[in-house]
Amino acid sequence: TGIGIGYIFRDRFSLRAGFYNADKKYTASPSAYNAPASFYSYYPYLVKVDADCRVYEIPVSLGYHFGARKNHSWFASASLSSYLMKRETYNYSYKTSAWGTVQQREWSLYNSNQHLFSVIGISGGYQRKITNRISFIAEPYLRMPVNGVGYGKVKLNSAGVLFSLAVEPAAFMLRKQKK
């Protein structure tokens, strides 16, 4: 869930920014989890990490619109995002010795990691006008961190489809009609 604002200029380019609230759940292998060295004195034989994180994502993107028709258009965009980690909950599966039984321990952090402009994104999408002021947008995306994310500095790539409604402000519509 979230909110964004954008502006299309010269009927081809767009600049957008947003604020999204997301839950990131993942499982990481010991080789993918890059915690500080002191961590491994507590979990010397890490088996896996299950994570459940609440993240605020703040993307800034530049887009190019092509194939514009009266009621629809296609676009491609590139973005840089900041991730603000609000809550990180980790469930560690580990052994105290190489032959020991697997044990579990949960640990949570709050407001501890901020990754400013450290996630690169690419997307493409389709925008369809519903009315003069409202459009529906479907936008498949791929996001890749430049550095690891969270306490374990995990390369948390993500992909999905963002569905959104775009509303053109009434004041902008009045200016367009006067031209």
Each language-model region and where it sits:
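Long, positively charged binding patches that form subdomain-scale interaction surfaces
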Residues: 11-15, 42, 48, 55-67, ...
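Extracellular/periplasm-exposed beta-strand and loop segments of Gram-negative cell-envelope proteins
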Residues: 24-54, 85-98, 102-115, 151-156
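Conserved catalytic residues of ABC-type ATPase nucleotide-binding domains
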Residues: 1-15, 22-28, 32-33
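Repeated loop/turn-to-beta-strand initiation elements of outer-membrane beta-barrel proteins
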Residues: 12-15, 72, 132-136, 170-175
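Solvent-exposed loop/turn segments connecting transmembrane beta-strands
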Residues: 1, 69-70, 149-156
